[in-house]
Each structure stands twice: as structure tokens, then as C-alpha cells.
Amino acid sequence: MIMSLGPYASFIVTSYAAAALVVAILIGWIATDYRSQTRRLRDLDRSGITRRSGRSAMDRP
């Protein structure tokens, strides 16, 4: 199944390639940020800092 894109083929292909590149960059950015946040949380847990959301209602003043 071969489609003829007409005289705008280069524009269409370039647009799809640019969109794919942007999506790939965003996925990479999110993956890098996730690893960074996970590492920071692990370091905080190791240092003894606890999360406020982990406390029960009875622990609050």
C-alpha cells in the first residue's frame, strides 16, 4: 500500500519526523526526571526524613 502524498510530501514527512522527535525528547526527559526524583526520595528516606503523608491522623498535633 503506497500512498502518494503529492507536492507537500516533504512538509508532511518533516512534520511527522519533528513531532516524533519532540515526543521522544519528552519521553527521555520524563524518564530522566523520574530517576532523579526516585534517587532523591531514596536519599531522603535513608537520611531519616519521613513523609508527612505517611503519618496517621493520631500522630498530628
Swiss-Prot record:
Localization per Swiss-Prot or TrEMBL: Cell inner membrane
Keywords annotated in UniProt: Cell inner membrane, Cell membrane, Cytochrome c-type biogenesis, Membrane, Transmembrane, Transmembrane helix, Transport
Zinc keyword on record: no
Top-rank taxon, per record: Bacteria
GO biological process, one term: cytochrome complex assembly
Main location: membrane
Gene Ontology cellular component list: plasma membrane
Keyword Nucleus belongs to the record: no
Pfam family, one: CcmD
Listed InterPro entries: Haem_export_protD_CcmD
Transmembrane segments annotated in the record for this chain: 11-31
Membrane topology: Single-pass membrane protein
Similarity remark: Belongs to the CcmD/CycX/HelD family.
Job of this protein: Required for the export of heme to the periplasm for the biogenesis of c-type cytochromes.
Stated name of the protein: Heme exporter protein D
Protein species of origin: Bradyrhizobium diazoefficiens (strain JCM 10833 / BCRC 13528 / IAM 13628 / NBRC 14792 / USDA 110)
